[in-house]
Amino acid sequence: MNKNNIIGFLLIAVVLIGFSWYNQPSAEEQRAAFVQDSIAKAKHAEMEKASKAAAVKRQADAKAQIEADSTALFYSALKGQAQKVVLKNEKVELTLNTKGGTVEKAVIKGYVGHNLKVKDGSADQKDVTLFDGNDQSLKFMLEAKEANIITSDLYFTPSNVTDKSVTMTAEAAPGKTLSMTYTLGDDYMLHMSLQTEGMAGLFSPNCNKMSIDWSDKARQQERGFMFENRYTTLTYHEAEGGTDHLNEGSEKIDEKIEETIDWVSFKNQFFSAIMVAKDNFDKDAFMTSIPQEKGSGYLKQFQAKMKTAFDPTGKKASEFEFYFGPNDFQILKNTEKESTFGKDLEFQKLVYLGWPIIRWINRFFTLYVFDWLSNVFPMGIVLILITLLLKLITYPMVKKSYMSSAKMRVLKPKLEAATAQYNKPEDQMQKQQAMMAEYAKYGVSPLSGCLPMLIQMPVWVAMFNFVPNAIQLRGEKFLWMSDLSTFDPIFEWNTNIWLIGDHLSLTCILFCVANLLYSWMTMRQQRDQMVGQQAEQMKMMQWMMYLMPLMFFFMFNDYSAGLNFYYFISLFFSAAIMWTLRKTTNDEKLLAILEKRYQENKNNPKKASGLIARMQALQELQRQQQKEMMRKQAELNEKKNNLGK
């Protein structure tokens, strides 16, 4: 990039900034727009509130009418006292409420439940409560002739109760029942079947579907609200394969799903609640995500309204499976073995591993190495060992890249001598050709160091996607870091500062300092190998390279300590490798080797091949085109002069 390019980019930036500033609304216009927006939101909220109130009133009126009629369906089931039934194993504990007959509390064992009000972790709980009480709601709705049956209104009677199973039954009339049977497996999967008995004549003729309304307020489980919120999504799996999620933002999202789906998940960063339908959920399921305010203890409020198959004769049960557990890739993948539906559920896709090539690296390399090392070493040591392993794998490419730069460095005096005559701006093409010819004499490819660096990029991006989703880092301590899965603040305050937030992360600062050091070393190395005007232009580019660590600080201050620590260690080792290579490279010996190669090429000239040959051919073509343009311009000028005479 030459001086004119830099000036051009700066002018474009100034024009864009100036245009944006000129076209921004005035303070009065902003206030007016804010007032109009507030009025519109208030009206919408009022209409929505009125609609919900009307629906609640209609339901209450219908319920009151049924309660007043002792002959109505489920008359006895509309009154009662709520009881708790607990199903548990070594992995999870689920509390069912006989009012509604569904799970009202899910506790995941073996994972630290953070007390977010105590920052030092001294009051953390030994287990994670995924939801409790009013956080979650699940109701099934059936269209009967007399009135709609809504399970959340009914009091069920538990029977056949064990630690892993229970049957909930609500009596519609003598000999007519609605039952829900739950069976808990050995891991995180809960099987449920809903079935009627003796109620075939009570339903509408076209009643072969049931409606499901499932909602949940996703709890904030981690100390970093913004970071956890980013990974908290309503995700669903299409019956034909593949997952998708709502594109949540700062506003409420309503979306109709046009495909048939077989499961829907309310996913936190590290834990999920999943509902699977054996006969799939029909098209046009309606999904909602509402963001919650920071400090409320919640991240988002999810709701899924769906329909699935229902047999009113009672011959076939409607079957569902629930997963309440961690977003651990291997656990999610192995959970399918507990499913009785025979589907390829692909739960493991809840763990985001990056774009296709990045996902492939994480899926078949990082995951296995990480799991293997984590069985032996603490997580902090695992990150260091993974860094060392990756550096060992990429070392041959790094060395090749460095040696290419070193060769150009020792050839710098010869390049300056060979290009000394090309000092004018119009001579830049000839100068480039002379440089390439000089490199070819010594068998040096100026771009041979680029490909190894490009090959390393997917590895760096793979770790960027893997570490924030690695539940193994959650709650793990290392050195001064109390939890590798969230930021490690050295200073915190109550107000939110633009770009920074409400804290300073120590590992982020270390990463940025290491980045600054590494940038200085690489810039110095590149400057030492550049000739003439290129070296001067590189000095102008330094400030851009030095701004990168500052940009990274604003980007990564909210990221997990584990990720920042990995980048810090990676850059530290990269700087150490570069320093070692510089100290162990003898410029005189390297130049002697190149001189020997030059003499061999001189005595046995070979045709240039590969990248150098293509670049030389391209430069020659450009030179010929430039020469032809100059000739035509000279002819045109001569004609103008003749006409002037």
Per-segment meaning from a language model:
Residues 1-57, 96, 194-197, 206-229, ...:
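Helix-loop-helix
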Residues 49-82:
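Short, Gly/Pro- and small/polar-rich lid/capping loops
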Residues 77-345:
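Soluble non-transmembrane domains of integral membrane proteins
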